[in-house]
C-alpha cells in the first residue's frame, strides 16, 4: 500500500488494483547511473513509500545499484541497464551481468538475450 505522502502527490495510487494488476516503474536510476544523486538508502525509502509492486532499476552502463537494492526492497526488483550505442539507447531487463560498453546495438541486443 502506498504511503499517505505518495497518495497525496499521486491520488490515483489510492485506487484499488484490479485482480492480477501490478504497479510497475520500468525505468529508474540510482547514483550509479551518473545522472542521478539518489543513494541506495534514498531509493529504498522512496520506493518503499511508493506502493510499487515492481521496479526496474536501469542505471546507465551499470547494474551495481540494482544488484545492491535487489534484496533490500519489499517489492520485486528487475535488474536492468540503459546502454548507449551509436544507434541510440537500449534498455536491457532481467540481466545477470553488465553489458559491455562500446559495443554495437546488434551486439548489445545479443548480450541482453
Residue locations for each model-derived region?
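An N-terminally biased module of ancient metal coordination in phosphate/nucleic-acid-related enzymes
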Residues: 1-87, 106
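A basic- and aromatic-enriched beta-loop-alpha substructure that forms the phosphate/nucleotide-
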Residues: 88-95
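Short helix-loop capping/hinge motifs at secondary-structure junctions, enriched
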Residues: 97-102
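Short, intrinsically disordered, charge-balanced linker/junction segments flanking boundaries
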Residues: 107-113
Amino acid at each position: 500500500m502506498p504511503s499517505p505522502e505518495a497518495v497525496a502527490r499521486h491520488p490515483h495510487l489510492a485506487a484499488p488494483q484490479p485482480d492480477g494488476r501490478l504497479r510497475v516503474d520500468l525505468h529508474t536510476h540510482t547514483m550509479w547511473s551518473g545522472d542521478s544523486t539518489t543513494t541506495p538508502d534514498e531509493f529504498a525509502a522512496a520506493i518503499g513509500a511508493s506502493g510499487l509492486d515492481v521496479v526496474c532499476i536501469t542505471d546507465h552502463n551499470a547494474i551495481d545499484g540494482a544488484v545492491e537494492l535487489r534484496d533490500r526492497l519489499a517489492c520485486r526488483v528487475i535488474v536492468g541497464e540503459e546502454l548507449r550505442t551509436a544507434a541510440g539507447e537500449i534498455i536491457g531487463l532481467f540481466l545477470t551481468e553488465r553489458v559491455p560498453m562500446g559495443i554495437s546495438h546488434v551486439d548489445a541486443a545479443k548480450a541482453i538475450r
